[in-house]
Regions:
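Local sequence-structure signature of Cys/Sec-based thiol-disulfide redox active-site neighborhoods
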Residues: 1-31
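Short beta->alpha junction loops/turns
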Residues: 10, 33-34, 63-64
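Short alpha-helical
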Residues: 12, 39, 66
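Thioredoxin-like thiol-disulfide oxidoreductase module
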Residues: 33-52
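Structural micro-motif
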Residues: 49-59, 68-69
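Non-catalytic, surface beta->alpha helical segment in thiol-disulfide oxidoreductase systems
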Residues: 60-76
Length: 76
């Protein structure tokens, strides 16, 4: 399973998403707006493949599932 979490600093739900995945014993790749995209949202949106406004955004096996609430639902 490939998990990518798109995040930004000071994002409570980004931290919750990362902790949820860690607590499930799964590995993930984090892509940070500031570190990986030079704080340019357009570059991040291009990588995500969809115009989204909320963070985090999560891809599982290269499919965008949405944000934190969708991540919780995915693993229920």
């Amino acid at each position: 399973m490939t998990i990518v979490i798109y995040s930004k600093t000071n994002c409570v739900y980004c931290t919750k998403a990362k902790n949820l995945v860690k607590n499930l014993g799964l590995e993930y790749t984090e892509k940070s707006l500031e570190k990986d995209f030079g704080s340019d949202p357009s570059k991040m949106l291009e990588d995500i493949g969809k115009n989204v406004r909320l963070m985090p955004q999560i891809k599982i096996d290269f499919e965008l599932i949405g944000g934190y609430n969708q991540l919780v639902e995915y693993f229920e």
